[in-house]
Amino acid sequence: ILHIFTHDNINFNIMCNNRQSAASNLSNEQLQVFLTSQLGDGHIHTTNSHSTYYVTNCKYEEYINYKIQLLGDFFKNKRKLEKNGFCQTPIWEMRSKSSDILVDIRNMSIKDILNHLTDLGIALWFYDDGSLHKTDLYYNLNTHKFSEEIHRELFVPYFKDK
């Protein structure tokens, strides 16, 4: 099935695995949040009952609220975890509603994800996994989870063209 997303005169064509889905209902903003879950923070999770949803967290409630705004009617709930991780510090967590389209997005290749990223998606990716070096005034994008091949063949050419 070929899903076509249209928002602000931008078309997003995503080839999926022969399933019906809610894809035609995604806005560009929703799509960008879900795409960046495959690159940076956030995760698309499938439960034992085959319900698939997006979840992310951040210590800054304002950023979680921004992602909630972007998700619009795909937002399900938000909560504060008082003790998280090794340091046991508070963190905010947000979850989307379940949708089959999230399975298709999770299964997209990195190349296809990069081809569908807009400036908003790049900004979300940098906020999730970037770091500003204030002394030398440059950003680092932490992409350690990806192979050297993906860096060489996809990320380097992608950012050279930006």
PLM feature spans:
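Internal intein/HINT superfamily modules and their associated LAGLIDADG
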Residues: 1-162
